[in-house]
Curated annotation (Swiss-Prot):
Organism: Locusta migratoria (Migratory locust)
Biological role: Component of the cuticle of migratory locust which contains more than 100 different structural proteins.
Domain notes: The tetrapeptide (A-A-P-[AV]) repeats found throughout the protein are also present in many proteins constituting the protective envelope of other species.
Phylogenetic classification of the source organism: Eukaryota, Metazoa, Ecdysozoa, Arthropoda, Hexapoda
Sequence repeats: 27-30, 33-37, 39-42, 84-87, 90-93, 96-99, 102-105, 135-138
Keyword match Chaperone: no
GO function term, MF aspect, one: structural constituent of cuticle
UniProt KW Magnesium keyword: no
Stated name of the protein: Cuticle protein 63
Keywords annotated in UniProt: Cuticle, Repeat
Amino acid sequence: GLLGLGYGGYSGYGGYGGYGHGLALAAAPAAIAAPAVVAAPAIAHAPAVAVAPAVAHAPAAVSTVSQVSYGTTHYAPAVAKVAAAPVAVAAPAIAAAPAIAAAPAVGLGYGQGLSLGYGHGLGYGHGLSLGYAAAAPALSLGYGGYGHGLSLGYGHH
């Protein structure tokens, strides 16, 4: 399983732990397979962030989580295992066209706006979002939009 704790993040993103400026602690396999990309219904007014920066300052088993969205296609996150040392992964935030979740059990985030779990669950970025991912049994609880708030996730992958 993957246990993630993060500060900030795409709330409502089922099972992949903290997002944005945050930290993901892995008690899980070194690599997690990304779900297959499938079509999803169109949802307007949901600008996506291309790459979510992850900053890790944690003990040995640390996974950094990145999420990439282009246009209306949402790619599942890549999870990479890193060594026990302060690690900083900084990528520029790129404004994208309105985008929606396109992978099973993947959430849609709009910074401080809407957060929608494509598997099961619905939330609001500035409030509380709770989602259950159908593709990989996972529970995600998050508060806040991109860059502030708290998100917590647990999943079996």
